[in-house]
C-alpha cells in the first residue's frame, strides 16, 4: 500500500477504480486497427466503500465490491481516499490539485462535504491524467506512413491510455493505443491527440509527406461508456518525430475530479475554477523544423451537488477541455500535433448557469508551419461531453451510524443528510461477512433514524446499512457496527416438544413479564405475544396459526433472554 501522500484510516471512505485494463484484445497487428478497443472489461469502473481495518499491506473494506476488478500486467486498480473535509460546512484554504498519475497512483481528486462547500480557491487536475508520449531520437529517412507499431526510438512514442502497455514492441509508431495518441513517424510528423469523450486529432503529415501522411493517429473516443458508471482520465498525446532535436512530447491528459456536497458556493475576489483539462504541448523549439506533440485529452469532472450559490463577484469556471496540439515554428510544412479530445463533466442536477460556465471543448490541431495548415483537431461537437441529471455518487452523507445494547435488544441509530430518495436496508450478520436484510426504512428527510432489533443472537451481532438510491438503484454501505450478547443461561426448555401449538416454556425468573417471539428458520417472525411467568413457567397458546415445521423461540425481557426450538406437528 502506497501511503506516501496519504495515510488511510479506519472509517475512511475510499474509491476503488479500475484505471487501466486489458482492453486491446487481438488488435495488436501492425496496421490501422492496432490499439482499437476490443472489450471495455472493467476500465473506468469504480466502487465507494469504507475501511474497516488497514495495515501496511492490506485494506479491509466494509462490504464486497459491486464491480469486478482485474489485476494483471495490462491493468491497474487504484484505491484512493474519498476525503470528507468536514462534518458540516467547509471553506477551502488553498488550491486543491490532483497528484499526477505515475502509472500506479494519482490522477484523482475526490472530496465530500455534507453541508456547504465554499470555494475560495480552485480545484484542478489539469494534465494529471494519462501521460504523453516521448519524442523520437534524432533520425531521418523518407516518409514512413505504414509503421504503426515499433520498439524503435526513431519514431515518436505513443501516449498513455486505458490499456497498460508492457510490450516494448508497441511503444512507438503512429497507431493510437486505445485513448492514447499515436507517435509521429518519419519524417518530422506530429503526434496524435489523446482521446476521451471524443476522438483525438490526427498528427500533422510531416516533412514532404503530404501524399504519405505519417502523423500519429488520435486516441479513441469513450463516449459510449461515459454514462456515469465509468470514469476515465484523458488520454496522453503522442510525441513528435525529429531529426534536429526540436520536437516536443505529447501533452498529458486531464485527471478525474469528484466533488460531493449539499451546496457549492464561491467566495473570491476574481474567479475560481474546477478543471481537468488536457495539456497543450509546447511548440517546437530552436529552428522549429521537427514534429510537435499531440494535445492531451480532457479528463472527467463529477459534481454531485443539490444547489449552487455563485455570485457575479466570484464566477465559477468548470472545464474538461482537450489540449491544443503543438505548433511547428518553421516556415516549411512539418507536423503539428493533433488536438486533444474533450473530456466529460457530469452534474447530478440540471446544468447550473447563474455565474457558472461549463465547457468540454475539443483541442485544436497545431500548425504544421508558421501560418500554414493545421494538423487534425479532435472530433465531435464542443460541449457534448456535458451530462446532467446523473447521480453516480450516492447523494447521502452518512454522518454517524451506531449500535447500542439495550438489555437483550440492539438499538441502531444513524444520522444523514437525506434527500428523501434513499432506502435504508438494515442488514444483520453473526460473522461480520454474510449479511441478511432484517428491515427497510425509507428516507423521509428527517435526518435522524433508529431501529430496534429485538431478536439479536447470542454472541457478536454485526449491523450495517445498505443505502440505495431509488431513482437509479445505486447503492453504498455504512461502516459496520456491532454489539455482544453474553450467553448467560441454559438453552430454553420447551415441553411438550413436538407440540400441536400449545406448550410450556421453563424460565429462570418467576413473576416477570416476557415477550415470546417465534420465527421460522429464516428469521421471519410468525408469532409474538407477551406473557407473565408463573412458577418459572410460561404457558404459550399459538392456536392453529403455525404450520407444521421447526421454529425458533425467543423469550426475553430487558434483563433476560433464552432461545430454543419447537417442532409443530
Describe the function of each predicted region.
Residues 5-9, 546:
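Short, well-ordered loop/turn sites that connect or cap secondary structure elements
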Residues 14, 424-426, 514-516:
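Short beta-strand elements bearing conserved aromatic residues within extracellular beta-rich modules
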Residues 24-94:
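Small/polar beta-strand repeat architecture
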Residues 96-302, 319-346, 361-392:
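Glycine-centric low-complexity/flexibility signal
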Residues 393-489:
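Short, compositionally biased serine/threonine- and acidic-rich segments at solvent-exposed termini, linkers
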Residues 396-416, 478-509, 519-525, 547-548, ...:
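Surface-exposed, proline-anchored Ser/Thr-rich loop/turn motifs
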Residues 418-422, 508-514:
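Short proline/glycine-enriched turn/loop motifs at strand-loop junctions of beta-rich domains
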Residues 442-463, 532-558:
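Short, surface-exposed loop/turn motifs with a glycine/proline- and acidic-biased composition
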